[in-house]
């Protein structure tokens, strides 16, 4: 049985709660000693993992809608993407303010050079910023065919973000490997599209170099 528009509306409400409740828990944990011995790292990892969860959920929607024959599920994709961006922004903010400190934000440039995994994280965030800014129907109409080309960069984020996570942890544990494995699986479901995008990009680069 296919989902109705009303059911999708209620699903959106549930997804908004799924985005908000972790934030409420984090606030509670900060104020009631619910974090570990290194609360700054705990906050950074929690916000980063939550952003990754919403990224994976966003990537899951299209194949799920296709294979489950639930076309209206696509309506939840933008919502999940915006929550991914929100949590990624919290992740970046927690690093900038809690790790570096307000008075040391100028060090961010140096950190990006000395810690390459931060560069991957910043690139991912900038892409998510662009996708969030252009996620409205008005921007979709304005950009035309370029809109889809821009939003295909979410696949690059799906590659860079798990690498950023794996690279940032001192000891490799199962958790970042699971996130990376899920990202690979979700990308593999799109291998035909990704191969087509790669071949198109290679052709464009070849044509420019041949001029």
UniProtKB/Swiss-Prot annotation:
It comes from the Bacteria. GO terms for biological process: protein repair. Its main location: membrane. Its cofactor is FMN; heme b. It is a multi-pass membrane protein. Binds 1 FMN per subunit. Binds 1 heme b (iron(II)-protoporphyrin IX) group per subunit. InterPro entries: Fe3_Rdtase_TM_dom, MsrQ-like. Pfam families: Ferric_reduct. GO terms for cellular component: plasma membrane. Keywords: Cell inner membrane, Cell membrane, Electron transport, Flavoprotein, FMN, Heme, Iron, Membrane, Metal-binding, Transmembrane, Transmembrane helix, Transport. One of its GO terms (molecular function) is FMN binding. The chain crosses the membrane at residues 10-30, 82-102, 116-136, 153-173, 178-198. It is found in: Cell inner membrane. Belongs to the MsrQ family. Heterodimer of a catalytic subunit (MsrP) and a heme-binding subunit (MsrQ). Part of the MsrPQ system that repairs oxidized periplasmic proteins containing methionine sulfoxide residues (Met-O), using respiratory chain electrons. Thus protects these proteins from oxidative-stress damage caused by reactive species of oxygen and chlorine generated by the host defense mechanisms. MsrPQ is essential for the maintenance of envelope integrity under bleach stress, rescuing a wide series of structurally unrelated periplasmic proteins from methionine oxidation, including the primary periplasmic chaperone SurA and the lipoprotein Pal. This is Protein-methionine-sulfoxide reductase heme-binding subunit MsrQ. The gene is msrQ.
